[in-house]
A protein has these predicted regions:
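A short, well-structured edge-of-sheet supersecondary motif
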Residues: 1-3
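Alpha-helix N-cap/helix-initiation motif
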Residues: 5-13
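Active-site-adjacent helix/loop patches that line small-molecule binding or acyl-intermediate pockets
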Residues: 35-138
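Active-site SXXK
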Residues: 12-29
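Short glycine-rich, polar/acidic loop-and-turn segments at beta strand-coil junctions
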Residues: 7, 24-28, 46-48
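Conserved catalytic cysteine-centered active-site region
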Residues: 31-33
């Protein structure tokens, strides 16, 4: 049974952040740094860039012995740091996972990076699709 247009391609954007955090959890990166509920929450969230949010994203990096300069998210207009970007927690978790898995840090956002391949594999598996059918993987 289906409703609507099941073949319609769509971008889920921030709704995929919890799925993008799966490698952070399953790799042992989250438990290795004992990030707690707040760390997991910021890794799955879009946030407002408040000091509290930026601090949680920084904590993920600090506990993973990573430098803020590795973040590949922009500095929001009127802000001082990429930590204030609404996706900084996701980026910090990506870096923590890459560090834990000994994957390259500088290229963590590239489609051919092992982390991005793992994220796509996990999302495709949950959707019951081959990874190459994901729009993001094209």
């Amino acid at each position: 049974m289906s409703a609507g247009e099941p073949g319609f391609e769509t971008f889920i954007r921030s709704a995929q952040k919890p799925f993008q955090a799966l490698p952070f959890l399953s790799s042992g990166a989250a438990s290795a740094i004992d990030c707690g509920d707040r760390g997991i929450a910021i890794s799955c969230a879009s946030h407002s860039g408040s000091t509290t949010h930026a601090r949680e994203a920084f904590k993920l990096l600090w506990q993973s012995d990573l430098d803020v300069g590795l973040l590949q998210c922009p500095v929001p207009p009127g802000s001082e740091s990429a930590l204030q970007y609404n996706c900084s927690g996701k980026h910090a978790a990506f870096l923590a996972t890459s560090r834990k898995m000994s994957w390259p840090l500088e290229t963590y956002l590239q489609a051919d990076h092992p982390l991005q391949q793992e994220v796509n594999r996990r999302i495709a598996e949950l959707l019951g699709l081959p990874p190459d059918e994901l729009v993001a993987s094209r």
